[in-house]
C-alpha cells in the first residue's frame, strides 16, 4: 500500500521532470504518478490533486518562496528543493485537511533523501518562515485534521 509520503515523492519527481523537460504535464502525471500509485486510489488521487494544485499555485508560491529565501532568486534554488518548496507552500495554502507540521516535515525529509546534504536545513528554514508569515497574515485556513498543531504555530508566532 502506498502512503502520502510516496505520493509526495512522486509529485516532487513529476514536478522536477516537468520543469526540466518543459514537457506535457498530463503525460508526466500519467507516467510518474498514476502508474506507480495505481494500486491505492486514495493516494493516487491525493498525488494528482497535489500536482495540479501546485501547478496552479506556482506563480504565487514562487513569490512567497522568494520573499523568504534570503538572497535567493527562485531559479537559483536547486530544482528539487524548488519543487519541494512549491509543493509544501501549496499544501499550506490549499490543503485545509493537512496539518502544517506534516507539510513542513514531509518536505524536509524528502529533501534529505533526494537533494543535497544541506537541502534539509535550507528547506526547513524557508518553509518555516513561510509558515509563520502565512499564519501572521491569516492565510492558514485549516479544518479538521488540518488544525492539529495550530496551537504550537500560534505560540511560535506570538513569540517572534
From Swiss-Prot:
Alphabetical list of InterPro entries matching this protein: NusB-like_sf, NusB_fam, NusB_RsmB_TIM44
This protein's record includes keyword Nucleus: no
Single GO molecular function: RNA binding
Keywords: RNA-binding, Transcription, Transcription antitermination, Transcription regulation
Gene3D superfamilies according to UniProt: NusB-like
Keyword Cell inner membrane carried by entry: no
A single BP term in Gene Ontology: transcription antitermination
Family statement drawn from the similarity comment of this UniProt entry: Belongs to the NusB family.
Function per UniProt: Involved in transcription antitermination. Required for transcription of ribosomal RNA (rRNA) genes. Binds specifically to the boxA antiterminator sequence of the ribosomal RNA (rrn) operons.
Protein name per its UniProtKB record: Transcription antitermination protein NusB
Species whose genome carries this gene: Salinibacter ruber (strain DSM 13855 / M31)
Gene: nusB
Amino acid at each position: 500500500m502506498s502512503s502520502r509520503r510516496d505520493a509526495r515523492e512522486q509529485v516532487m519527481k513529476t514536478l522536477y521532470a516537468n520543469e526540466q523537460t518543459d514537457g506535457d504535464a498530463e503525460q508526466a502525471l500519467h507516467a510518474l504518478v498514476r502508474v506507480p500509485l495505481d494500486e491505492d486510489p486514495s493516494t493516487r488521487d491525493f498525488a494528482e490533486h497535489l500536482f495540479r494544485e501546485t501547478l496552479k499555485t506556482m506563480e504565487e508560491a514562487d513569490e512567497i518562496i522568494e520573499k523568504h529565501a534570503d538572497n535567493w532568486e527562485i531559479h537559483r534554488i536547486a530544482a528539487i528543493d524548488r519543487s519541494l518548496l512549491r509543493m509544501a507552500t501549496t499544501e499550506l495554502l490549499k490543503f485545509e485537511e493537512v496539518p502544517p507540521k506534516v507539510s513542513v516535515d514531509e518536505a524536509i525529509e524528502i529533501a534529505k533523501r533526494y537533494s543535497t546534504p544541506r537541502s534539509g536545513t535550507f528547506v526547513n528554514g524557508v518553509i518555516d518562515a513561510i509558515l509563520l508569515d502565512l499564519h501572521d497574515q491569516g492565510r492558514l485556513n485549516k479544518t479538521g485534521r488540518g488544525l492539529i498543531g495550530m496551537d504550537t504555530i500560534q505560540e511560535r508566532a506570538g513569540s517572534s
